[in-house]
Amino acid sequence: VSSSADEPDADDLRVAIVRILADPDSGRRVTREANALLDANDPEAMRAWLETGYRIAQAEDDRVAITRLLADPDSGRRVIAEVNALLDANDSDAMRAWLETGYRIAQAEDDRVAIARILADSSISPALRAAANAALDDNTPEALRHFLEVGRYQVA
């Protein structure tokens, strides 16, 4: 039973933590801390973590995810430049926002450059040229990435 009508009870706190665990953006630290809280079953600790600890854990997980992009061979110049700027700024809110929307946009720009490089090769087949142009015509981040990861290998 909640001590106040506005405060979530223990079951509400557990549900909130389980929802965080179900989020694919939850990294290792968030997962580790959330599981430990569920195991301990301490409503006050859960409340405190949801109020402040979760943001701290998510910020660390976001920093790790962003840093890993530096080692990813698919990360092009725009992604790397934006990652370095984010790491220099050290703003956890900016990192979260970039992971949610900015990364997709930066990767799409890098993918457009990669496809343009493929098209610049005069020895590619007409089918590969058509598939590359179709990806550029579609111009969605998903179509560009799909062409680079799958589509270019499916044409003769």
Which residues are covered by each model-predicted region?
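Extended, compositionally biased repeat/scaffold regions that form elongated interaction surfaces
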Residues: V1-A156
